[in-house]
Amino acid sequence: MARRILVTSALPYANGPIHLGHLVEYIQTDIWARFQRLRGNECYYVCADDAHGTPIMLKARERGVDPEQLIEEMAASHQADFADFLIGFDRYHSTHSAENRHFAELIYQRLEAGGHIERHTIEQLYDPGEGMFLPDRYIKGTCPRCAAPDQYGDSCEACGATYTPAELQDPVSVISGERPEVRESEHFFFRLQDFEALLRQWASAEHLQPEIINKLNEWFEAGLRDWDISRDAPYFGFRIPGTEDKYFYVWLDAPIGYMASFRRLAEERGIDFDAFWDAGRAEETELYHFIGKDIAYFHTLFWPAMLHGAGYRTPTAVYCHGFLTVNGQKMSKSRGTFITARSYLDHLDPEYLRYYTAAKLSDSVEDIDLSFDDFVQRVNSDVVGKLVNIASRCAGFITKRFDGRLAPRLSAPELFRTFTASAERIAELYEQREYARAVREIMHLADQANQYIDAEKPWERIKDPEQARAVQEICTMGLNLFRVLIIYIKPIMPRLAEDAEAFLAIGPLAWADVQAPLLDHGINKFKPLKTRIDPQQVEAVVDASKETLAQSESSEPAQGPSGRLAEDPIDEPITIDDFAKLDLRVAEVRVAEAVEGADKLLRLELDLGGETRQVFAGVRQAYSPEQLVGKRVVCVANLKPRKMRFGTSEGMVLCAGPGGEDLWVVGPDEGAEPGMRVK
């Protein structure tokens, strides 16, 4: 019996273009959805633009347009990029829609009726010039712990301390430059702790990956807190029913966008919406969310609790993936590795990135790396040199010598059975999102197909008229092996599959078609299905990305220092005695883990060559914990220990960069050992 499945990806924010980091998730989800359809399941894939929030409101104002116009432009850009990358959404919608307003209000009203919404008065910083309360990221000032200037309203990137905006010294509004004032405001809170038993039970089942279950258990141990679901006007979003100046926080209505998108699709196609969302019918269908590991908190705590509290089903599973690094480092605009989807599409085949991404992905939250050299080598070797080459080596003989007709029998039926016997194993790997292992299986079979052709040597046999029938059967065999491989690779490379189907003069292939060979059948003249990547094409993508960055920067001529020094001038001179006060040591990171409640902090355990130190470092937006374990860093070893609400920090790790995602840990050259002094 066919399964009934609804699949979603996280919603891209509608204030900027799609980039390669985004595409990891959409490629991963699209492959899985295509595989399910290929297997004969009823599978729908929906998504939407996340179109609410202060950043969109302010960006629209900066451009002199209404927020509605901005999100409309972004929607067109996003959908064009997704279409060109062959992301096969059944419906792409927007959170700024009538459907989303309906469900946001309905869920809120049901939660309120159930006693799960409370109101509390809180203190916030208010910009009197702009007439608005300021989110943490729109406040800057001096850190109350280390006195570092130009720090955000929630944490210090210099020392890693966290604090409330009210504690920030000399605060300034990023929007107006004015000093904000403290004002009180009534906010609406969702009582998450009401659902702890449900969430613990849900997390213990097979709904999540082990790494995410471990993280959930940490959150449970720390205690679930009420969630502020409201924002004050002015705000671009949906007004909370019964209020005049309160709006739903963007993270409340964003996941509800999954429901809104599917509702629109259901109305368009006559699908039973309730079968996929009603709590009483959860056994009839399956619901899967594919997301990045950075938003697991919202999707594994708030979202299932909201759904359950409002009478809807909880997800069958939430699948998290890691981030994308490029050439071993996080994406960087200055290096040209912060690549937009469009910059890539202007120079390279989208299926090459789909293939390479699949060849890296597994059911893990580990980050994956796009190495340009490996990308070129793997695509040229696997896709062109192995897979497509099978058809290229066989097709010419069939069309030129046998009038484009395949033989009525296979020359090596046992080898064909070996290929078809792999169907269930490869299917299981797709099902478990172990794409890298599936690709290895497929390419191993491609190697066997090429070895078969090498051994049979049809180019030599064709010289003997008496072996013409054998050559026809050998090439028929080769093309049938190619056809099986195309079925296996079809979820990853749908356009290649479509072109192969046209060449073989057959209709759309399904997974079940692997079992029966294609015999005594006319095919079309072969045309190259894929071409090799020229490394210069990759260079062109990088150069184009750098040009995009340059165009976005000010065109004003530089006055005085240029480059980084213009942005961050050198401080006043110090004496050698001042410098000598710092005891800098090489240290090795033995443990790295995220700090609950601190978006920027990682807790590090550093080996200083005989002594272990605990350090809280504000590098979470730039590095995952896994990237730092085993890494050698430079530590300020004689910094006075500082008590923080998460524990005591016993040093400081040196980093370069302006902060946030643009941060690089400073490390010693090879050979430096933990405990060595840095002079």
Swiss-Prot record:
Question: Where in the cell does this protein reside?
Answer: Cytoplasm
Q: Look up the record and name the cofactor or cofactors this protein needs.
A: Zn(2+)
Q: Top EC class per UniProt?
A: ligase
**Cofactor-binding details, from the entry:** Binds 1 zinc ion per subunit.
Q: Write out the residues that bind ATP.
A: K333
Please list the reactions this protein catalyses. Answer: tRNA(Met) + L-methionine + ATP = L-methionyl-tRNA(Met) + AMP + diphosphate
Name the domain of life this protein comes from: Bacteria
Q: Where does Zn(2+) bind?
A: C143, C146, C156, C159
Domain (tRNA-binding): give its ranges: 578-679
Q: Which GO terms describe its biological process?
A: methionyl-tRNA aminoacylation
Q: Where is this motif: 'HIGH' region?
A: 12-22
One Pfam match, given by its short name, reads tRNA_bind
Asked if Ribonucleoprotein is a keyword of the record, the answer is no
| Family statement | Belongs to the class-I aminoacyl-tRNA synthetase family. MetG type 1 subfamily.
Known function: Is required not only for elongation of protein synthesis but also for the initiation of all mRNA translation through initiator tRNA(fMet) aminoacylation.
Q: Which PANTHER family match?
A: METHIONINE--TRNA LIGASE, METHIONINE--TRNA LIGASE, CYTOPLASMIC
Subunit annotation: Homodimer.
Q: Which HAMAP family match?
A: Met_tRNA_synth_type1
Q: What is this protein called?
A: Methionine--tRNA ligase
The species this protein was found in: Halorhodospira halophila (strain DSM 244 / SL1)
- Primary gene name: metG
